[in-house]
């Protein structure tokens, strides 16, 4: 390291890093500035890291960051789309963070070998978690745990999963509100925000004169019912009153 300088991660990236077991072999997809791989090496969490990005610019930023901390020789920099630049046998942990849920979905869809119990997946969608969660569960990725991080006044979910499991559908509430967040201290406020946004969406649909929006309004009502139920269960489990 450059004079023993330690990299400080954002709370969102730190939450992901803390879930990576010491000795892991990691692929960081969409590595951007390479901050997560640098932190993992500094703290002895990984024995191998492939820092991957589909654009040369971010990958060059990652190289420069690694040089600043004297770690450029310990990282494998890969230029390629998604997991296309990763050899399945060289890793056991896959991190895909800071992308939209639909983008994460498409990356995994293009790499069916990830649906195997040998791999731990750490996913952090910036948007469309309600699209990503059902797809994962319906394709045999089981949720090991979830947590929320509040960053820039937005609640971001972090998910740990493993492939090779039985496929099962999720409820609307689980798709939107999470699968394993019952004990998360931020879940109550995150559900409040979801309820506010879904109510706003429903109000807009109810004012619409487009026939198709009636069906969409019914779905929003169903989502709201299940989210309210989840909020009640969270309050009960955490000994709180509404």
Predicted features, each with a name:
Residues 34, 38:
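Glycine-rich SAM-binding Motif I of class I
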Residues 55-57:
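Conserved SAM/SAH-binding beta-strand->alpha-helix loop
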Residues 2-11, 15, 84-85, 90, ...:
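Class I S-adenosyl-L-methionine
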Residues 48-53:
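Conserved SAM-binding motif I beta-strand of class I
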Residues 91-98:
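Short SAM/SAH-binding signature in class I
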Residues 23-32:
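Conserved class I S-adenosyl-L-methionine
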Residues 41-42:
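Gly/Ala-rich phosphate-binding loop of Rossmann-like dinucleotide-binding domains
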Residues 60-88:
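S-adenosyl-L-methionine
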